């Protein structure tokens, strides 16, 4: 059963009446451009056909009752009182979004009953949290008929995750969940929020392979990467690493390396990765899948060697995928790192070959069974 059907059904069972409306917000996969978003850089994700559905109805008071179907828990809070953190981590994503919507729209106090469910695997790097934030943001916007655009809802979602949940994420995940387009990857300039849609090449599929090694980014590694990038930006005297050209980096690389080895390595990844994203857009437009494959491989190597966010299981998955796909297409880790998924752009005729090579080798080598998802690029958040 699809999340939107499950949300509607469980809403009726839980509350004893039918939901008025349902919102669906997709997860995302990032084709290339990793950890560049919070450096004001470039990313190239697409929204995917896995996501979060929220069925909801207005109440005649200011209370939100939120039923999380997948874990059978409920949260309740009152929009006419200051919104405080909950002991349930999932509930803080909901409360945080509503809190920052109220900062923008102080008159918003419309109560509601909600039931929500997701088929985005948790801790996979496919943005289960952004799908939750954007679905809640859109729900609130509909409930209150609020004058909020999709990009604003995305930035409110990011604010909630940064300030209320305590994960220092960039804005890519939320922007993609809000602004995704069917059959397109979207290059996002994370500073101007300008979007450049580019069609997914004809005859290619997007495969996402979950290593099933879990990660949780609220803890230290992610935040330390941000601090190292900020150190490097200060070293170059710029607002963000986006403002450093490859030539400027090369000119002062030895000096930065002598001062702070880690900041040097992190900056090397970010600056080269921004360049790879810009080249990837051109490769896609030219239908040059050999070039795109090389850029994806370069991105993975840089994440492994300079940003140091991959793990042996992920490196092995990428290696297997690259063997299966060959030169036309590519594979790399996607998401924050330390587990999660790899993304592949694979010729349709090689999908089963890819699936088989990984099934025959990954578990044998690691003792963990992978999960294989074929995805399509989808529209962003919408009412169903």
Curated annotation (Swiss-Prot):
Active site: 173
Catalysed transformations (reactions): alpha-D-galactose + ATP = alpha-D-galactose 1-phosphate + ADP + H(+)
Chief localization: cytoplasm
Binding site for substrate: 34-37, 222
Recorded superkingdom: Bacteria
Pathway assignment: Carbohydrate metabolism; galactose metabolism
Gene Ontology molecular functions: ATP binding; galactokinase activity; magnesium ion binding
Protein name stated in the entry: Galactokinase
Organism name: Actinobacillus pleuropneumoniae serotype 5b (strain L20)
């Amino acid at each position: 059963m699809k999340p939107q059907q499950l949300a509607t059904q469980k809403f009726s069972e839980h509350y004893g009446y039918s939901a008025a409306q349902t919102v669906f917000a997709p997860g995302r996969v990032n084709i290339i451009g990793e950890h560049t978003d919070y450096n004001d850089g470039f990313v190239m994700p697409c929204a995917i056909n896995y996501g979060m559905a929220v069925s909801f109805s207005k109440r005649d008071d200011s209370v939100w009752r939120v039923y999380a179907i997948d874990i059978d828990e409920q949260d309740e809070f009152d929009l006419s009182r200051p919104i405080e953190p909950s002991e349930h981590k999932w509930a803080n994503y909901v409360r945080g979004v509503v809190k920052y919507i109220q900062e923008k729209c102080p008159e918003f106090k419309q109560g509601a009953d909600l039931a929500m469910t997701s088929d985005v695997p948790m801790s996979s790097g496919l943005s289960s949290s952004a799908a939750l934030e954007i679905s809640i943001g859109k729900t609130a916007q509909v409930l209150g008929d609020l004058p909020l655009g999709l990009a604003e809802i995305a930035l409110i979602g990011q604010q909630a995750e940064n300030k209320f949940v305590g994960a220092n994420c960039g804005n890519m995940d939320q922007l993609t969940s809000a602004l995704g387009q069917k059959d397109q990857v979207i290059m996002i300039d994370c500073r101007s929020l300008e979007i450049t849609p580019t069609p997914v090449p004809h005859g290619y599929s997007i495969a996402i392979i979950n290593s099933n090694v879990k990660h949780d980014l609220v803890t230290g590694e992610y935040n330390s990467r941000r601090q190292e990038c900020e150190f490097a930006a200060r070293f170059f005297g710029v607002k963000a690493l986006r403002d450093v050209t490859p030539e400027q980096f090369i000119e002062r690389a030895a000096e930065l390396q002598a001062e702070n080895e880690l900041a040097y390595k992190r900056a090397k990844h970010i600056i080269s990765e921004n360049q790879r994203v810009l080249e990837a857009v051109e490769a896609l437009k030219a239908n040059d899948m050999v070039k795109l494959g090389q850029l994806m491989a370069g991105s993975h190597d840089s994440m492994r060697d300079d940003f140091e966010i991959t793990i042996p299981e992920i490196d092995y998955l990428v290696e297997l995928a690259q063997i299966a796909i060959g030169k036309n297409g590519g594979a790399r880790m996607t998401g924050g790192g330390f587990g999660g998924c790899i993304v592949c752009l694979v010729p349709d005729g090689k999908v089963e070959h890819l699936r088989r090579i990984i099934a025959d080798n990954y578990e044998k080598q690691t003792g963990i069974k992978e999960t294989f998802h074929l995805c399509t690029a989808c529209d962003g958040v919408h009412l169903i």
